[in-house]
Amino acid sequence: SDAFGITGFDQVFTAQYRQNGADIAAYVARQESAAAAQTTAEAVRDFYLEYGGTSLDGPEAVAVIDILDTIEVVLHQGRYVIGVHEAPDRETALALVERIRNRLQEIGDDGS
């Protein structure tokens, strides 16, 4: 089924984290190729913007969106789409995304 109500965004692994006293959902979805991951990450970003989200400043190639008083973060790394769903603030969301990116690199799976 489609994750977070986003058509075509499926086969998504989600996990709950407790970060800075808040419960946050993070996700990873492996795609066929880096190009497919980029397209999917852009579709996720566009979904939140279409439904009233506001883009915030973030690191290069990382979408940070404020929507309904929560923060969404989405990016692609190789064949992976990585994101954080409904974080309480930008800093917490970006810190969790960075943990996931680092973990993928540690295990030798950079998504390529």
Predicted features and spans:
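Soluble, non-membrane globular domain cores that form compact, hydrophobic packing
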Residues: 1-112
